Amino acid sequence: MKRNAILLSLLTTLFLLPGKAVGQNTSSDGKLVYNFPFAPSEGLVNRTEKEYRKEICLNGYWDFQPVALPGSYVQGKGVAPELSLPKEGAWSKTRIKIPSPWNINSFANRNVEGPDHRNYPSYPKEWEQVKMAWMKKTVTIPNDWNGQQIKLYFEAVAGYTEVYINKEKVGENFDLFLPFSIDITNKVAAGETAEVWVGVRSQSLFENNSTIGRRIVPAGSMWGYHIAGIWQDVYLLALPKVHVEDVYVKPLVSKNMLELEVTVQNNTEKKTDLQLQGKINEWVNLAGTDVNSAPVPAWELGQEALKVAPVKVSIPANASTKVVLQVPVSGELSYWTPEQPNLYAVLLSLQAKKEILDMKYERFGWREWTLQGTTQYLNGKPYQLRGDSWHFMGIPQMTRRYAWAWFTAIKGMNANAVRPHAQIYPRFYMDVADEMGICVLNETANWASDGGPKLDSELFWEASKEHLKRFVLRDRNHASVFGWSISNENKPVILHVYNRPELMPQQKKAWED
């Protein structure tokens, strides 16, 4: 408790400096106004890619329609009610602000009325008890997106999610914390409008109290299992039909080798022959040093450090190909460490008949974590980690500003590591950690401390495996991430809360698989 009080004091000090220092003033109606963006960000498409890739951020006002639970529904039976389609003329007069859970005002709202989580006073009180709902947004597809692959991209939606385009279902998702995308190329047309429906059922509707536990998906701690709705960014993306789908950067420091595992996607009707090539540049941090400017992304590419030699790639129609590129390193790259968090940018291009088809950017650090016994090694040398850990507590943490303040406090205590606890944090936490030199023990949303996960359910374990896989794929290129915590307190809960030691072999096998 004392440690938490100290950390809270440090965080408060960082934000509550004199008004002039933090850009605050008082408006004519007596409101305290902060004159800088609450959540500064760069978007999904990097500026080096924008000649070839496009995006429209769909954040902002959406229409909202609550759906009542049927009278026959019984909580805790493991069978969720069906989500009926939205009704014409039944949309709420109050629009929802995306990203935000629709029941946000009920989080941490017991005897103390929040206090700092009542961030959406316009939301009707009845939304706090809604368990399933629809959200609607109309968007116009730009004329210059003709011939592109078009995707809807969600950074995170809490609940069982169904997505419709122009009243036709195009996809679904049931993970509360991780990104997903849906190809809608054949459902929309350049120059025309599209109506997006997103239907969400709270994970609590799927809970099963028949034996031990109740939650059938990894749902995190207090924040995760409570919220419902679109709680992170939404984008509409346009990609070239032939593009780099994924880049896995492997900094093999001990072998003096940088390995790039590149997946190239061909969404055309014919085989494509092309050339894959690239370069590696210094990533230079230009962020400010005061409390307002330091959390704001600001950078430029520095000198070219290495070239990625061109290779020929042949991709069948409507298929993908994985290419492994190896770049020898002989002192051209400086180590990433907490003391010197040097970063680099990989820039890969696809070229056919001297025409560049696509450009892909990926940031990384030249570092390698290894274990010898119980000792952590960073770049071949023993490295001691001193860290902090905390639960995710909602809207105040939905900004790089909080990550910067938290990590600044950690650095100020002569520490260098963090464990974002009990759920998957938004990816900008890892971005800031990369830039500030904070070592991250990433943790899944498999949090068992309240006895909530249904650890005897095959549904839970299948969801957990997919959850872990998607988590690693999201964060594996971050220089700051040194490990993966796959669960929290599962063993003591199995042994001392459930009193079911026979479940231990099942858990061990699930993670081994």
What do these predicted regions represent?
Residues 206, 396, 425, 491-494:
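Active-site environment of divalent metal-dependent phosphoester hydrolases
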